[in-house]
A protein has these predicted regions:
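Conserved small/polar residues in nucleotide/adenosyl-binding loops
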Residues: 363-369
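Long, charged amphipathic helices and adjacent flexible linkers at domain junctions
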Residues: 294-320, 365
Length: 370
């Protein structure tokens, strides 16, 4: 069937169908080809059942040939070119911090919420040394981001994995509990998807944290590079900022996040047996160039340093330390003393066994004296 299909739908026709920078247009073009084949093979049920698989294989072969032999990407970009970028902060007025980051037809909005340290996530796992998690990053990939209407059944393996990658990328730049006594939660909502949503969520989260007044050490950006290989070790093309089609039909998705000064997280998905040292070196170099471009030309012009205060609607926290032997006096008999302070001032007071006292106000712009 494949040979007959290629004779009917020429390689030139398939190349024309996939050569567009609009995902919906490309999908419509491929669907039109499938409809022509369905009409041609209407009397052959066996071949009708194979149309989807055959068109996918033909599309993959065409895209790989365009990239490897012609050095031409499906959306017309140069091998090293990044898709159009856009960033903004304070998209949502009522939240503690928000930001939007867009790369081509991939768009991510991240919302930051701040809370007291007592609201950190409690962990019940094998590692007994880690019982709480102060920074939480959640990644949501709703069906509407790819133009579908399937029901949401909670986070899957993909959402959990992408959220964990973005979380690891940002943890190295977060302030300590002493510097910033807050629990921090970021939620990345994928508004539109055409590849590299995990890296987009890293960029959006970095912007959102700075907009929320979290004193991060440096902004973090993420980028993915792809790979298409030929017959020999030297026959390959590395693609900067891969879109969905290049991810599906390529051999690698190499994700790198970091600051101007270094890398904070790496993840590689690979479909071939291995990589040469030259490929690895070039891939890391490409991500460095792209990261510098994103940070310098897109993110930093929007917000270059964290705001010097948390937002109007974020809780205000004052931290102090007392002698652990005095904790019982602060609490009082059956909590009488501490509850009286809470009732009088309207604040929340958290005391741990080491004598750290966090006074949290959700209603006052400044903390009352207690």
């Amino acid at each position: 069937m494949y040979d007959d299909m290629v004779a009917f739908i020429t390689p030139e026709a398939m190349e024309e169908a996939v050569f567009t920078d609009d995902k919906q247009t490309r999908e419509a073009n491929i669907r039109a080809i499938e409809e022509k084949l369905e009409e041609r093979y209407a009397e052959n049920e066996e071949w009708l059942a194979q149309i989807g698989e055959a068109v996918y294989a033909f599309q993959k072969k065409t895209v790989r040939k365009m990239i490897l032999k012609d050095h031409k990407r499906p959306d017309g970009r140069d091998i090293k070119q990044i898709r159009p970028l856009h960033a903004e902060v304070d998209c949502l007025p009522r939240v503690h911090g928000s930001a939007l980051f867009q790369r081509g037809q991939t768009q991510v909005m991240t919302v930051t919420t701040l809370g007291s340290l007592s609201e950190a996530q409690r962990l019940d796992g094998i590692d007994v040394t880690e019982t709480t998690k102060r920074y939480m990053h959640h990644y949501n990939f709703p069906s509407y981001s790819v133009g579908e209407t399937r029901p949401s059944r909670g986070p899957g393996r993909r959402e959990i994995g992408h959220g964990a990658l973005a979380e690891r990328a940002l943890v190295p730049v977060l302030p300590s509990e002493e510097e910033f006594p807050y629990a921090i939660r970021t939620v990345s909502e994928i508004m539109e998807s055409n590849g590299s949503t995990s890296q987009g969520s890293i960029c959006a989260s970095s912007l959102s944290l700075m907009a929320a007044g979290v004193p991060v050490k440096a902004p973090v950006a993420g980028i993915s590079v792809g790979l298409v290989t030929g017959e020999g070790d030297d026959d390959y093309i590395i693609l900067t900022d891969i879109q969905g089609l290049e991810d599906f039909f390529g051999d690698m998705d190499f994700k790198v996040a970091g600051t101007h000064d270094g890398i904070t997280a790496i993840q590689m998905d690979i479909k071939i047996h291995g990589l040469t040292p030259d490929i690895i070196r070039e891939a890391i170099s490409r991500t460095k160039e792209a990261r510098e471009h994103i940070l310098t030309n897109v993110m930093e012009p929007v917000i270059s340093t964290p705001r010097d205060h948390v937002g109007e609607y974020a809780p205000k926290i004052m931290q102090m330390h007392v002698d652990p032997d005095k904790i019982s006096e602060i609490i009082g008999k059956q909590g009488k003393t501490i509850n009286a302070i809470i009732d009088e001032t309207g604040v929340k007071i958290d005391i741990n066994d080491e004598g750290r006292v966090d006074t949290v106000s959700y209603t006052h712009l400044t903390l009352p004296t207690t």
